[in-house]
């Protein structure tokens, strides 16, 4: 059995989430719904952005946004503010989501697609946000244009040096703002939509909606902020002077102070190098992957239950070729398999198995532990079927006799995930002499393999 202590990174996450559990209750702990909150914010951004799109005019960007904010303060102004603050919130929750998955180690092996697409979504969001600020064409937009032009000055692809281009009123044409508006809309709607689809593509039944209470709370907070501190224009652009003191959004524009502090070569090295490391993190020092699940065709009856329960769509049904009287048989997609054992718990004919943790080994272990417990303690024995990721095993489990510390009559058998447990395991424990059986898995929203606790509860 695997008796490893929790890493420092996991301790950080569980400490923060434990505090949030006490504050919000586990059912409404926002840290369990970071991804779905991001999806909800994207919906709010799309709705408010669509409203602004109908009123935006590329011939007079500043005047348009000023009119929406002032003349329509009761609706247009609120929509603009929600668009702004929901976008800020998106960056915050994307970073929290990525940071949580990194600290929990949930970005390697079969999860690399979600990690890479998630980082791409973060960078794309920042790009879209910067373009959005440009579309207002106030002093803040002018500063962004100048700073961006200076960053691009070393790239030899421009006929005219970028800083001079952005400082020329002649280049600030209606066509330029049309192109920027098109880029803002297309990248946000099409690009981010595709990335979001890729992000959840390997998850069965992806969760994209937060609990109603959390969604309502987020919306109310955004509306209150919009009323208390509405998003407004900075001063109009003046081509005769360079803007100095302008309102600043650190969530999107943080790269510009960083570029001002660091030498240009070092800035590009940090930016490009950091981005590359972020994207290749799943392959840096990753631990050995656990053997993936295997299917015994002779036991498979084509019921599709393992295919339906798999949290990562790592099992597909293929036509049978062995002449048995079933249309299909299950087949594991190794690259997507998490080795969680959910398919093992789903099957009534024992067709799936984990090479390093078979049901035969588990049943033999249960029988042995119950025999030794009865022999040594001479009293009732209880068996705990425990997800190895749901507890700090070194803290709670006595390694020598596989029991809970201070409770020698409570034997513990660990599983890769609670989703591997089904009624047959419990029946075996009872038939082997257990006076009681309990199952311990991850709490709601916290399952390392997404749906283990859900399936364990449903099967029992």
Kindly label every feature range from the protein language model:
Residues 1-14, 314-318:
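Membrane-proximal soluble regions of multi-pass membrane proteins
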Residues 10-13, 19, 23-54, 63-83, ...:
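Membrane-embedded alpha-helical bundles of multi-pass integral membrane proteins
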Residues 58-60:
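Cytochrome P450 catalytic domain signature, combining two hallmark sequence patches
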Residues 133, 144-147, 221, 359-460:
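Iron-sulfur-associated redox domains of electron-transfer enzymes in respiratory
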Residues 244-247, 316-319, 323, 402-403:
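Active/binding-pocket-proximal capping segment
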Residues 286-298, 353-368:
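Membrane-interfacial segments at transmembrane helix termini in multi-pass membrane proteins
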Residues 298-300, 337:
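Short Cys/His-rich zinc-binding micro-motifs
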Residues 305-338, 342-365:
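Iron-sulfur cluster-binding cysteine motifs and their immediate structural context
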